[in-house]
Each structure stands twice: as C-alpha cells, then as structure tokens.
Amino acid sequence: MKIRTGMESFMKQDNNIPEIDFVITWVDGNDPDWQKQKMEYSMQPDLSQKQDDRKERYRDWDLLRYWFRGVERFAPWVRRIHFVTWGHLPSWLNKEHPKLNIVNHKDFIPEKYLPTFNSHAIEWLSLIHI
C-alpha cells in the first residue's frame, strides 16, 4: 500500500528531482538574553503597546520540531536546511545533522546594523547572502 504524501504531483516521475535548499528563520522569544537585548534597542520600552511587536509574535509554539519531521519524511530531496537564528537553538535540534547549516545573524548582516529585530531585513538578507 502506497502512502500518499501530497507531494506526488510536484515530484518528477523519473526521480530526476533537482536539489533545493530550505531557508528558515527562527527566534526564541522566551530567551532572557534575547529579550534583554531587544528591550535595550527598542524604541518603545513597553513592547505590548505596539500591535506588530507584541511578545506573542515571538512565542515559540514548538511547531518547528514538527516542521523538521515533515521535511525529513516528505521532502528527503532537500539538499540543505539553512537555519537562521539570533544565536540560540532549540535544545532538541540535532546540530550535527549533515543537512543542517546553522547561520547566525552576524554571519550575513554587517556589524553596524546589528542587532536587528526586523524580521523582513533578516529574511531578505539571509536569502541574498546564504
């Protein structure tokens, strides 16, 4: 019995699937060091006042664990996963996995612009420089 993954229509039948990379950005909003640095550089001391910058936006729902499991099961053709982070990592993450490339913000953002908490800048710059 063949299990349908939902990816069959995207996969070439001749197994000549091009290798691609995934880029994923992640932040642990519960990290006290990250919170402290964010507060120090924030224009607005009370982050809850600004709708777009609420603490809930940075909450770790632990969904990343399932995302990695899904990639491993349904997208084995992925060549590399570039994991872009402020510097912290989930405790459960296998840092030695051969497909994983851990990228710190300081690896691709010029020092004069760090730290940055602008997700748009992080995402666009990581796509260009990784």
Could you tell me what each predicted segment is?
Residues 59-63, 110-122:
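A short, glycine-/small-residue-rich helix N-cap motif at loop->alpha-helix starts
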Residues 67-70, 121-126:
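Short, hydrophobic/aromatic alpha-helical segments in well-folded domains
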Residues 2-107:
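N-terminal anchoring/stem segment of glycosyltransferases
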Residues 128-130:
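Conserved small/polar residues in nucleotide/adenosyl-binding loops
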